[in-house]
Swiss-Prot record:
Keyword Ribonucleoprotein: no
Family label: Belongs to the CutC family.
Name of the molecule in the record: PF03932 family protein CutC
Signal peptide: none
Amino acid sequence: MSFDVYVIRVFGKSRGSREAGMSVSAGLEVAAGSVASALAAQEGGAMRVELCHGLGGGGLTPSYGMLAVVRERLHIPLYVLIRPRGGDFVFSEEEMEVMCCDVECCVRLGCDGVVLGALDPAGEVDMGMMRVLIAVAGSLGVTFHRAIDVSADPGRTLEDVIALGCERVLTSGGRSSALEGAETIAALVAQAAGRVVVMPGAGVSAGNVLELRVRTGAHEFHASARSVVAARRLGPHPDIHDLGGDYDCTDVDKVRQLVRLLSQGAS
């Protein structure tokens, strides 16, 4: 199905109401790459899960099977990353079709929101593509992801995100970690002035989350809170590193620690 057909299909749809105000107390969103990680996030007290696949490469859209099982078992809000491939955030018409189909799956399964982002070749928000994706999402909440960090002008991107009606934007302040980008994040929080939630992410941990809160003024934080899980050694082939190796999973104790710190540091 072509991009134009999608425009015709969804142009008349209503997004529904979305809340964009800052919460008074601080909360934690956990990026989860598996069913086990999502359940650990919930057990640890996270306020929301962002479900994705391939966290090591910035995250991709999870499989339908993973999404269906997590939706059935999770009782806290579930947002789903919609990203069909790694690399940049300039998407083709075919990739747009894939993203629309993935968003429709989220709607059918009763997810609470989606995490989106699309840029044009000039590094500006692709407003046309974003409007179509948001229309397909209907009443689901929308987070604009870290495409803002590679956009031409983060301040202008923030205004576009607000104009689109997104609930929040995830950002590292254009740096490798949120701590390195804290000054830029603080500027975005001030610019947003409560019109959208600015959520720091990338390298957020128990060792820096309170510093980030003080330096940025943010009230929502995004972390994976992962630990390495040792793989079972099932055969005499230890040198095949791409098969059967160790893997990461959300650590419930790390989630609890982050949640506890944010609760203690609440203003």
